[in-house]
Design a protein with these regions (language model features):
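ATP-dependent small-molecule kinase phosphotransfer cores
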Residues: 1-56
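Small-molecule kinase domains that catalyze NTP-dependent phosphoryl transfer to phosphate-bearing small molecules
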Residues: 2-24, 98-143
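Short N-terminal helix-initiation segments at or just after the protein's N-terminus
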Residues: 2-3, 17-25, 72-83, 154
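A short glycine-/small-residue-rich loop at the edge of a beta-strand within enzyme catalytic domains
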Residues: 35, 39, 77, 81, ...
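Short gly/ser/thr-rich secondary-structure transition/capping motifs
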Residues: 38-42, 57-61, 114-119
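ATP-dependent NMP and nucleoside kinases share a basic, alpha-helical "lid"
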Residues: 43-95
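Long, contiguous binding/interaction regions
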Residues: 62, 66, 80-84, 90, ...
Length: 160
């Protein structure tokens, strides 16, 4: 079964918006209504590649770590956290009425992300070996997590 192309993120329209605003005519990529999940992934991969080659950028999800794997300046991060922590954050964002619903939402999203990532990369989603840094978001505040990632990037850049 081919995973749904939007399984990786909630807002798959980014690629369409980017193509429309950045490239004007999207006819090079075919008619949107006729794109299969594999064709959409191919378009997405080309767009991500162009963005990565244009200069520093941050791309969340979309198998960007795999798409940009040949770039020497790539830095990939996987952020995870225990189910209870994720459920509380989902409820705090008002995306679920209670923690039980939030856990169902998180599990469904993870299942889709895992299927999508594994299918298109041949790798195992979430495996620490696929990323330069893997962090448990429940261990630090969001600000501390950001600071840690920035510190890691600065230390890495100093060695390059």
């Amino acid at each position: 079964m081919i995973p749904n192309a939007d399984a990786d993120e909630k807002r798959p329209s980014f690629i369409r918006t980017f193509l429309g605003s950045s490239y004007g005519n999207t006819s090079d990529f075919g008619c949107w209504g006729s794109l299969s999940p594999d064709a959409l992934y191919d378009v997405q991969s080309r767009v991500i590649g162009r963005i990565c080659h244009a200069g520093p950028c941050v791309i969340v999800g979309r198998t960007a770590d795999y798409i940009a794997r040949e770039l020497t300046n790539l830095f990939s991060v996987f952020i995870h956290s225990p189910e209870a922590h994720r459920a509380r954050r989902i409820v705090m964002r008002n995306d679920a009425a209670d923690e039980a619903e939030a856990i169902r939402i998180a599990k469904k999203a993870d299942s889709k992300r895992e299927s999508y990532y594994n299918y298109y990369t041949g790798r195992r989603w979430g495996a620490a070996s696929n990323y330069h840094l893997s962090l448990d978001a429940s261990m630090l505040s969001m600000e501390e997590t950001v600071d840690l990632i920035i510190s890691f990037l600065k230390a890495r850049a100093a060695k390059m």
